[in-house]
Amino acid sequence: MGMKCIGVDIGGTSVKIGLFETTGELLDKWEVKTRKEDGGVNILPDVAASIRKKLDEKGLDLKKDVAGAGMGVPGPVMPDGYVEVCVNLGWRDLNPQEELSRLLDGIPVKSGNDANVAALGEMWQGGGKGYSDLVMVTLGTGVGGGVILDQKIIAGKHGLGGEIGHIHVRDDEWEHCNCGGVGCLEQVSSATGIAREARRTMAKSDKPSALREFGDNVSAKDVLDAAKAGDEMALEVMKTVSHYLGLALAQVALTVDPEI
């Protein structure tokens, strides 16, 4: 039986974990809730405990059967894995790859910005296979971007390369983004941004809509489901969301000129 490896995608709502062959074949996947309270101190211990439990279930030994782990973090990551601040998780002054390695008995762990490593994965095994230059955008709790040129991740001097979610796209915004800016793409085209746009649209219109039954608890999924069903207000929300996403992607395309 060959060595295995582990992939960890830390999101603002959940952490998705996969067990793989070193060839990239997925053997199992599962997730745990992202506990962001108290500065996110429980996130990595929860991940480590979940990995140990899964390995035990499969009769695998952490030290003998696992070659290492790769981890995606929703924010800027320095080349050595250091994270100065990750607002979506509450982290400050943390090296998550060192901490997760410590919690997993010292196995090798490498971390990077989630969208960057997702783009790398797509180039290796997914929709970007066969391409040397690509841009990937991730839409979740936030908006991330990964840029690969000549098969190399463009992370930048401070790990901020590809932070597409914080491109300024909207001049009529008045609330601050998590990054401290105003008018960022993430404020309108992320899952949380879609829900917020829906609440704003409901507040300024008397138009009937299936979204009204959810009130302030409306989610991005509710909006998407209603839009697919032809709900006029939901379609209006998605038109706004898509407009700003397209505006940002056009800027990126003109800047880096990717193949895909």
Where in this protein do the model-derived segments appear?
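ATP-binding/phosphotransfer module of carbohydrate and carboxylate kinases, centering on a glycine-rich
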Residues: 1-68, 77-80, 98-109, 121-131, ...
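A charged helix-plus-loop insertion that forms the helical arch/lid used to bind
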Residues: 82-92
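Short beta-strand segments
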Residues: 9, 68-74, 136-142, 146-148
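Short hydrophobic alpha-helix segments
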Residues: 30-32, 87, 157
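Adenylate-forming
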Residues: 118-124, 145-147, 166-167
